[in-house]
Amino acid sequence: MPTSPPPSARDLGLPRSARDLYTRLIGEKVGAWPALLAECRAHVQRFEAALATNEFLPVAEARRLGDALVRLRDRARGHRDPVFAEHLAWVAARYFVIRDDGAQDFEVVGLDDDLAVFNAICAHLGFHDLRLDET
């Protein structure tokens, strides 16, 4: 079954701050999901640990995003073009685990770009129910 070409950062309507990294990540091949999901859990744990020194960190958003990435990966596997969908899910998860992406993750609004990437990918794949509120 043919795989669709990946959408550009502009096609997804990503914030300018997220476009360069998204474009780099879209060139990656999907790797080992168990390892990447472990990195996602570790990233959430770093947020939880950092909460002791900064009560304003977006820990709740990190938890929601970490959980939602697992659901996105699972749904991608059942998509009409699973190779394409899983590749985009991979990009969303990789974007999340990179601390210095469009914005420094460990700042008050540091996950806004991560949420924007996740939500844009969900919308592009037609998984509107997986989208997270950007608080």
Predicted regions and their residues:
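Terminal, membrane-proximal amphipathic helices
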Residues: 1-90, 116-135
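Membrane-inserting effector segments that mediate pore formation, membrane fusion
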Residues: 82, 86-118
